[in-house]
Amino acid sequence: MKTALTIAGSDSSGGAGIQADIKTMTANGVFAMSAITALTAQNTTGVTGIFETTPEFLGQQIDAIFTDIRPDAVKIGMVSSAELIGVIAEKLRAYRAEHIVVDPVMVATSGSKLLRDDAVQALTEKLLPMAEVVTPNIPEAEILSGMTITDAAGMEAAAKVISEKYGCSVLCKGGHQINDADDLLWRNGSGKWFHGKRIANPNTHGTGCTLSSAIASNLAKGYDLDTSVERAKAYISGCLSAMLDLGHGSGPMNHMFALKGEFVGE
């Protein structure tokens, strides 16, 4: 069985973060492991508290994983400090980690920045050059490229800049801001559009975590990047189409929509 590691924060409500990652990896047929960067008290209406892991303990978690069950792919999500980013980069380099997917969680849904400037600098200098693919949304792509994005051509220009600057492939997510469910993959000097069907579901908590984890899962199984993105988009469409409706805010998706078996039924 192939294996995958998520390095990210914990979401107490189960819709995003490592909880979404573990569900996604399991649903996509790989054995999931986690190294937690922070504990959060949150639900579908917002975040009420954050308790950050120490750099030393994060390093211990990564050591414990790589010295026993080596991951075939690594997904990196929310990392809130330059110190934690430094530990992740150091450990992944030392263990020669493969198939690294970076979801650069930098901007909240409200538009406010989630990372201090020193953490953004550490992310761009230490993690992005190690990534096989980075998966920014529009606001994150604007920060990474230093450009303003208003249309598909802007997505292509920004993705090209990010790819050339950091030496990685870039999946620029259009979301609801540009082309609904259309995403652009820029790799090896050219772009490829992945067109998706717009699903009218207001419950989208954890979509970014889920997409990046699904990509990592498929890379772990040996699929190339194009196929991994295509399969990941199909998976997240299934999650959204299941129309799970929980909580009082933007609720979670049903990561296990395709789960079948004698223990699933009521």
Where are the language model's segments positioned?
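Conserved phosphate/ATP/ADP-binding segment of small-molecule kinases
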Residues: 117-191
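Short, small-residue alpha-helix embedded
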Residues: 19, 142-143, 201-225
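Phosphate-handling active-site elements
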Residues: 29-33, 192, 218-232
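N-terminal basic/disordered segments at the start of proteins
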Residues: 14-30
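Short pre-catalytic strand/loop immediately N-terminal to key active-site residues, enriched for Gly-Thr
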Residues: 7-13, 191-205
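Charged C-terminal helix
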Residues: 52, 226-266
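Conserved N-terminal subdomain of the carbohydrate kinase-like
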Residues: 3-6, 26-109
